[in-house]
Amino acid sequence: MTSQDFDLVVIGGGPSGYAAAFAAVAADLKVALIERDRVGGTCLHRGCIPAKELLETAAVHRTVVQAGEYGIDAQEPVIDFSVAQERKRAVVERLFAGITHLVGSKAITLLEGTGRLAGDHAVEISFN
């Protein structure tokens, strides 16, 4: 078993986790960030961001449907779900790349695995 010392170990690389890691690094702490999947967490990859992108597609559709109320003659819009899905995927990937770049550009040790508290001042990691 390998042991490393950190001032702060963050379990979970979602929005709160990476924000905590960034703040700790800014305070000159030695930081490890443990993430079992992809930095950004559920919010970025399967939750908040993908849902908001699809809601934005629906909002644009609604705006086009209501365009006639403003004197704009627009034909009935049709949502191409494959295009909406591709846009959603591209947005998620762009944000993921940005977060990954930020983590890599700071003095944060990214550990890919599942972390759990293992006693006073100890974290155990099951690596992927």
Where are these regions (language model features)?
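Beta1/beta-strand and adjacent pyrophosphate-binding region of the FAD-binding site
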Residues: 2-16
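Glycine-rich flavin
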Residues: 3-6, 22-29, 34-128
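Short alpha-helical segment within the catalytic ATP-binding CA
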Residues: 19
